[in-house]
Amino acid sequence: MRKILILTGRYLPGHKDGGPLRTIINITEALGNDYEFYIVCLDRDHGDTKSYPYIEYERWNIVGKAKVWYVKPGGFSYDLIKKVSSGKDLIYTCGFYESYGYKTLILNQLGKLQGIPVIVAAMGTFSEGALSHKPLKKKLFINVCKVFGLFKKVKWSVTSELELEDVKKNIGENAECIIAEDIPRTSVPGIDFNKIAEGKLHFCPEFALQKIC
């Protein structure tokens, strides 16, 4: 069974990231019987100062059909990314602005990821609306990444032809893109998402991509 590493800001039991979080849940629950999913994310929800209760550090927590490694703020180091990438068949990073994203691109460019294919989820990053927010900072960051060749050895995951055009417009016509439409909403055994949103769910680690691959 192929092993897929997903690097993202937040995962269950978090709920504040909305669409991006829901997408990862749908992928892991829909394809979890065909692939082994390993997710590395922060140990707390967006804007929270406290970590999730009952999680364990420095080990994989079983969450639904995925194994999740929780990281404290500032914990996405180069060494950690290399460590969790070892033995994986594919690395899927949710964007590139965050430290886990650009550090993965740097390691990939330097040949430190053992040749493991890297997929970057565009996640609307290059839409006109997204780029209009802090435009100078974002364009500078994108251009620096391009100058150092950080986008040359990756593939982009997009959800539509329009997003594909946005990527090529900002990265270049040679950007290799894969159109993978969103997977239908799925449920995770033992999790009531309404209770998560209401802050009533007590999380316990024991509850228990085809196009991209």
Language model features with spans:
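N-terminal subdomain of nucleotide-sugar transferases
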Residues: 1-55, 60, 86, 152
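Conserved donor-binding/catalytic core segment of Leloir-type glycosyltransferases
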Residues: 3-7, 179-182, 188, 194-213
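Active-site proximal beta-strand in glycosyltransferases
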Residues: 4, 90, 106-128, 155-157
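A short, histidine- and acid-enriched strand-loop-helix "catalytic/donor-clamping" loop
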Residues: 12-13, 99, 118-136, 186-187
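Alpha-helix capping/helix-boundary segments
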Residues: 45, 98, 162-164
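Short N-terminal targeting/anchoring amphipathic segment
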Residues: 81-104, 114-119
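Membrane-proximal helix-turn-helix segments that form the acceptor-binding/catalytic region
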Residues: 138-157
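Carbohydrate-associated surface elements
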Residues: 162, 182-183
